[in-house]
Every structure is written in structure tokens, then in C-alpha cells.
């Protein structure tokens, strides 16, 4: 299965964290030299300087403020996941139910190759939000470490959620990038999990549902085509020498 780029929710997260920081800032904080540098850096897109300014500010004023949340978010934007994890985890000690911090911590754990810990976070997050995006991310991680029954349970829960046409996602196929409906992405992973549990007909049906939603969804089309190839070969197998075809996710694809 090709890696899905989980960016749209993060863009919303970044906007919400920054806007919340702006609303929560006191007049004294706005006049602080480090915050002035931070604001100037953000206005010019200089995230490196923004990080330095916030570190100086937090060093002086302490971490019990929303600028620490913003620092975690900027570290995530920069791909500095260990630093993002540090600050999101630290802030969750003070705000254990903050969904933005939970999301940043979970994604950081995944990027740091700690999928089990990331799954624990996203299970709690999805229970709070019932967000289709969080459902997809949880399924993706569950499938990645072959927690297939859990992945299917999450998929079944996600089917009860409301999906809107604007719920979309991007994905990579080799050097190319595609775009599809979030629900199609959920159907695709659901199909892979079912197929890997030897529920091949059900898995195929979910690939077909994904393609029905978006006929240009390359990953689902590849998986569906792989199943047809496997089925064709299975029909030609000598009954005295049966084979056990693998998952379509393991078939060679474009890289």
C-alpha cells in the first residue's frame, strides 16, 4: 500500500493553533521583544527564526502558555518530530484533553517509528472526535502493523460517520501525487485488511466501492487489478498443486 499523505487535517490544525494563540495572547505578551520577533518571522514565513524566538520567550516566561502549543506545531511543520513530541507531551500534562496536542503527539510518535504508542493516542482521539480523518489515520496505522481486526472495526465505525465531498486527501504513487475522496481512501484500506484476513470477496467489494467513488483513484484501481490477476492465475492452478495468493498490497506496483 502506498503511503497516504495526511496533510489536509494538519493544515486545519496549524491554523487553529495559531488563531487560538493569537486570541489568548495578553497585551504584555504582544509587547515582548521575543514575541515581536516571532510575529515578524511568521509574517515573512521564516519558521526557523520563529522557533528561536519562541524558545527564548518560553525560557523567560515558562511553558504554561499557548505559545508552547504553537512551538510544537511549528516543529511539526518543519518535520522536527522529536521536538514536536516533546512540547505536545509536555503541554498535554497541563491540558490532557486538548485534541490538537493529542493529534500532534500521535503523528510525532508515528513518524518516530512508534506505531503502537501512536495508535493508543489516536484511539483516544478518535473516540473524542469521531472525525473521518482521525478514523482514516487510525486505520492506516493499524493496518501498517497488521492489527487487521482492529483496522476493520475502525472501518466499520467510520462507515457510520458523515462524509462530505470536501473531505479529500492526497496520496503518492511513485513520484506522482493523486487526490481522492477520504471515504474512498477508507474503503481502500478496509479492502486490504479484509483481503489479508482471507476475506477476499469482501475485500474486492471494498476496492470496487472505492473505485466507484473515484474512478481515478490509482491505489484502489491497482489493488482491484491485482486481485483480478490473482484470480485469473488461481483459475489456472493445478488442483493437485494449490497456491495461496498474497495480498494485493504486496503485488509489485509503480514506485
Predicted regions mapped to residue ranges:
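Register position in tetratricopeptide repeats
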Residues: 43-44, 77-78, 111-112, 144-145, ...
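Residue-level recognition of tetratricopeptide repeat
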Residues: 64, 98, 131-132, 165, ...
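Canonical positions in the second alpha-helix
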Residues: 56-57, 90-91, 124-125, 158, ...
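N-terminal leader/linker segments that initiate helical-solenoid repeat arrays
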Residues: 17-66, 252-255
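TPR alpha-solenoid repeat register
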Residues: 67, 101, 134-135, 167-168, ...
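Terminal, low-structured helical/coil segments at or just beyond the last alpha-helical repeat
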Residues: 22-23, 177-255
Amino acid at each position: 500500500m502506498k503511503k497516504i499523505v495526511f496533510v489536509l487535517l494538519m493544515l486545519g490544525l496549524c491554523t487553529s493553533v495559531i488563531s487560538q494563540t493569537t486570541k489568548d495572547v495578553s497585551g504584555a505578551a504582544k509587547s515582548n521583544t521575543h514575541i515581536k520577533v516571532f510575529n515578524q518571522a511568521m509574517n515573512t514565513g521564516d519558521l526557523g527564526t520563529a522557533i528561536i524566538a519562541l524558545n527564548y520567550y518560553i525560557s523567560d516566561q515558562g511553558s504554561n502558555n499557548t505559545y508552547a502549543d504553537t512551538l510544537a506545531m511549528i516543529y511539526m511543520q518543519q518535520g522536527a518530530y522529536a521536538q514536536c513530541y516533546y512540547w505536545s507531551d509536555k503541554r498535554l500534562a497541563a491540558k490532557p484533553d486538548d485534541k490538537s496536542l493529542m493529534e500532534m503527539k500521535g503523528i510525532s510518535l508515528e513518524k518516530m517509528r512508534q506505531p503502537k504508542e501512536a495508535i493508543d493516542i489516536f484511539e483516544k482521539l478518535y473516540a473524542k472526535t469521531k472525525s473521518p480523518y482521525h478514523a482514516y489515520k487510525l486505520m492506516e496505522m493499524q493496518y501498517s502493523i497488521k492489527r487487521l481486526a482492529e483496522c476493520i472495526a475502525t472501518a466499520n465505525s467510520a462507515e457510520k460517520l458523515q462524509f462530505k465531498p470536501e473531505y479529500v486527501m492526497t496520496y503518492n504513487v511513485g513520484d506522482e501525487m493523486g487526490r481522492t475522496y477520504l471515504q474512498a481512501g477508507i474503503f481502500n484500506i478496509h479492502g486490504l485488511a479484509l483481503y489479508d484476513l482471507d476475506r477476499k470477496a469482501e475485500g474486492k467489494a471494498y476496492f470496487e466501492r472505492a473505485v466507484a467513488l473515484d474512478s481515478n483513484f490509482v491505489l484502489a484501481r491497482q489493488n482491484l487489478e491485482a486481485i483480478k490477476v490473482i484470480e485469473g492465475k488461481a483459475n489456472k492452478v493445478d488442483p493437485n498443486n494449490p497456491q495461496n495468493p498474497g495480498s494485493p498490497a504486496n503485488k509489485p506496483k509503480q514506485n
